[in-house]
Amino acid sequence: MDGFELPTAIDISSVVGLIAVGIFTAQILLGLLLSVGYNPIRHWPRIRGVKLFTFHNWLAYIGLGTAFVHPAILLTSPTAGFHVFDIAVPIWSPTQPIPNTLGAIAFYLVAFVVVTSYFRTAFGRHRWKLLHYTAYAAAAVFCVHGIWADPLLKNRPPDFIDAEKAYVEVCALLIVAATIWRFSYGKRTHRFGRGRLSRSGV
């Protein structure tokens, strides 16, 4: 078809990155609900058979996999010029090394959260809870990466009202607002992290 161009590897990588941001946002929001003991059977929508803990865990695994695929796709691009080392340690990547490094740091932080959560019984509840706060750092760094990085890898300055950037900004604001609500709720009820967690909760 005339005028139709297939998306490039760079285009696909950008979309996958946005999907990862959405998954991590949903995962953190769900985690905040679980931390206050939310149960869809006892509370709205009062639906049985919904296992939020399992869903929370799988969101983390899927999000981590999506975040891995996001830069890995660039290895197939004939124009991006990325190699495996540029993905793993992007401080020397061919374009926008600082935003890319932030993205890599966010990925490693998420991986740390997922792995330590899977083996949380080995750490003990109190120590694991402290380690789990790394998720907030991961979210912050990931959002900064998403807002700062040029999705076309052309080192353009960020356009904060661009649709993609606005999407990341909204996700960041949702996380901030939900976190403020969570700690405000905790102060009112003296309930910090007492929600029931699954054996391998993430």
Which stretches of residues belong to each language-model region?
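Membrane-embedded alpha-helical bundles that constitute the cytochrome b-like, heme-associated redox core
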Residues: 1-202
